[in-house]
Amino acid sequence: MRIQIDAFDRKFNEIHERYLLLLSMTDKADLYKRPRELPMSFAMFSVGEYLLRSAAAIEQTFGGITTRLWDDPFEWTLPEKLTTTELVIDYVNESDSTRRRGMAFLDDDSALLKQIPAPSEIKPIFELLLDTVSRAEHFQGRAFAVFQMLSDEKLPRI
């Protein structure tokens, strides 16, 4: 059975669709625009930076599942490299392709119990995927919050 795997797959698809939606709503000039910094608050990043962090979390996890290489995609996801909305969309799609290849490795729900060496410790794949969904949605939520700070547009229902 693939009940849990299919649930994860749907969740990752939803995240991917929201990337594309937010990128289509974000003005090119606002992609890497940061809200003004306030004293005594956490550092804020741009819509583009948060979306890249979100997609990079997914790419790193599925790269680890498929190749056991837990490289942080930080170097090739810098705003200096991905300067346009189109390049960010290309990266988001590339991250999704990596995820699809990784999901194809999982034959049935019992595969989620398999323990693999993650970046800092051995974990079941289920736990890795749950953590990845959480991190990806967290960064994506921040991207939507920054979008709302910079724009007068109403956020879509998600």
Where are these regions (language model features)?
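C-terminal ligand-sensing/allosteric alpha-helical core of TetR-family HTH transcriptional regulators
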Residues: I15, R53-A57, T61, Y91-T98, ...
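Surface-exposed helix-capping loop/turn segments at secondary-structure junctions
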Residues: M25-Y32, G102-L113, Q148-L155
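Short, contiguous alpha-helical
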Residues: D9, L20, L31-W76, P117-I158
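Acidic/histidine-rich alpha-helical segments that form the ligand environment
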Residues: E80-I116, P124-R142
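Amphipathic alpha-helical packing segments from all-alpha helical-bundle domains
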Residues: Y19-L22, S95
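Short acidic-aromatic linear motifs embedded in glycine-rich loops, typified by GG[WY][YF]DAGD(H)
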Residues: Q4, D72-T84
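Extreme N-terminal tail/first-helix region
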Residues: M1-E17
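Hydrophobic alpha-helical segments and helix-packing faces
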Residues: F12-I15, M40-V47, K81, T85, ...
